[in-house]
Design a protein with these regions (language model features):
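Short Fe-S-cluster ligation motifs
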Residues: 314-342, 366
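Short catalytic-loop micro-motif centered on adjacent basic/acidic residues
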Residues: 42-49, 74-75, 136-140, 163, ...
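Active-site groove signature of glycoside hydrolases
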Residues: 93-113
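Active-site mouth loops of central-metabolism enzymes
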Residues: 14-26, 74-84, 112-115, 210-219
């Protein structure tokens, strides 16, 4: 399949429905079927999603139930796992139950880990995997500076496609630098994949004031649809990923993309107004990717604690934020943090997690 002809909505397999801390297979099957029946077929997974269970679930809910040529499957290699890349790739094929990946990405490249990917000859490895027919296309997901991105793409023309984090609140974020990354990708004329278009749900669960602005402009569409359409309207964007957890989210997203319409001038003005308001709210820019949890020696549920903090700041259902904090910290509270900074070293958003946990202690434990 040509990369500029991928379906517009990609199914991110990192926030699947759960029951009793396990992926709900039956609900996931229902979502897969509804997505496929809508004529969409792009599935994105990774080695550590759902603590390593995402790939095996794909085998059960997708690979065993649909012909191989009916879907486009994407997986990624994470250098930070410190495992042999050939062993990881072999494990991924076995977990997913496939003989090849339609697209394989070097996962989460940034300024601080590029040298590791280079040292392990990962770019040359990708070329070899493609020659062997084990992958159809080769690319990378990226979280670094525009300058380093430009250097990588100039040095490695074998990169066919790049996945970046982009949403309307991060376009001019000095840490994320989505606008600069997008401009570099346009310079190299590469197709673009978008992750975190709704910023882990932050741009779907907005304050009442912001919600009213969106609803005044168009009362018939969801808040999330604005963020998805913003990302999908940008030049060279071929697929926008959404980590969907419910059939309701899926149906809403399908509705957004089934007869997709790019944002018009007036809608961009609404987005600009909302962006200015959101910046004043100073919410924690967590996307609930959960990378921080896997390496935390205290097993602190950092994303859920941050959800409680954000809810408190928005002053929506204030007592519910305290109740949520109590529920998600039954085993380990924010005060259990030993300040090892393991979480901060793997956070794609480069958040000052320790400081925010200290804030949670002040807000919820005093």
């Amino acid at each position: 399949m040509e990369l500029n002809k991928l379906c517009k909505l990609g199914f991110g397999m990192m926030r699947l429905p759960e029951v009793d801390d396990c992926i709900d297979i039956e609900k996931t099957k229902q979502m897969i079927d509804a997505y496929m029946n809508a004529g969409m077929n792009y599935f994105d997974t990774a080695y550590m999603y759902h603590s390593g269970k995402s790939e095996t679930v794909i085998k059960e809910v997708l690979v065993k139930r649909y012909p191989r040529d009916a879907y486009f499957l994407v997986d990624k290699f994470p250098i930070w796992m410190n495992k042999d890349k050939d062993e990881v790739f072999k494990d991924q094929l076995e977990r997913c139950g496939v003989e090849y990946f339609d697209l394989y990405l070097l996962h989460g490249i940034e300024d601080g880990n590029l040298d590791k990917y280079e040292k392990e000859n990962c770019f040359e490895w990708g070329i070899q995997l493609k020659k062997e027919g084990k992958i159809k296309h080769f690319g990378m997901s990226y979280h670094g500076s525009p300058e380093v991105l430009d250097t990588i793409l100039t040095k490695h023309p074998e990169i066919e496609i790049v996945q970046i984090q982009l949403n309307y609140i991060d376009m001019d974020n000095p840490i994320i630098q989505s606008r600069g990354q997008h401009e570099v990708l346009l310079k190299h004329n590469l197709p673009i994949l978008i992750m975190e278009p709704v910023k882990g749900g932050t741009l779907a669960n907005v304050s009442p004031n912001i919600e009213s602005i969106f609803k005044q402009s168009n009362p018939n569409v969801s808040i999330a649809s604005w963020a998805l359409r913003y990302a999908a309207s940008l030049e060279n964007v071929v697929t926008v990923l959404s980590g969907m957890s419910t059939i309701e989210q899926l149906n809403d997203n399908i509705s957004t993309f089934k007869e997709f319409k790019a944002l018009d001038h007036e809608e961009y003005q609404v987005i600009e107004r909302v962006t200015d308001m959101m910046k004043k709210e100073k919410l924690i820019a967590c996307t609930s990717c959960r990378y921080c949890i896997d390496g935390c020696p205290s097993s602190i549920n950092i994303p859920e604690i941050f959800k409680a903090l954000n809810a408190k700041k928005l002053a929506k259902n204030d007592w519910l934020s305290e109740d949520h904090y109590s529920m998600v910290t039954q085993n380990t509270k924010a005060s259990s943090c030993i300040k090892c900074a393991m979480c901060e070293s793997v956070c794609p958003q480069h958040l000052h997690i320790i400081e925010f946990l200290e804030e949670a202690v002040e807000v919820f434990e005093k």
